[in-house]
Curated annotation (Swiss-Prot):
To B.subtilis AbrB and SpoVT. One of its GO terms (molecular function) is DNA binding. It comes from the Bacteria. Transmembrane segments: none annotated. Keywords: DNA-binding, Transcription, Transcription regulation. The keyword Transcription applies. Disulfide bonds: none annotated. PROSITE patterns: SPOVT_ABRB. This is Putative transition state regulator Abh. Residues 5-50 form the SpoVT-AbrB domain. SUPFAM superfamilies: AbrB/MazE/MraZ-like (SSF89447).
Length: 92
């Protein structure tokens, strides 16, 4: 684990502010959900990504399929978009 040298106080409602530079680096936008994990005395925050969401379109449908031993989920539309991008890249 890497320290980024930032310390924040917890306010009276139990909130902390995540620095904008950190949010940008981790692609965390306003209204994004954050997952909390506990590992011993550590609290780990992770951007929440629901299971089954298409990597290309963000869609969650019953038609989504997993590829690469479950590492990539694509909707039919997302699979088509990815295929077109790969084909275009191979032509270059």
């Amino acid at each position: 684990m890497k320290s980024i040298g930032v310390v924040r106080k917890v306010d009276e409602l139990g909130r902390i502010v995540m620095p904008i530079e950190l949010r940008r680096a981790l692609d965390i936008a306003i209204k994004d959900s954050i997952e909390f994990f506990v590992d011993g005395d550590k609290i780990i925050l992770k951007k929440y990504k629901p299971h089954g969401v298409c990597l290309m379109t963000g869609e969650i449908t019953s038609e989504n399929k997993e590829y690469g031993n479950g590492k990539i989920t694509l909707s039919p539309e997302g699979a088509q978009l990815l295929l077109e991008e790969i084909q275009a890249a191979l032509k270059e």
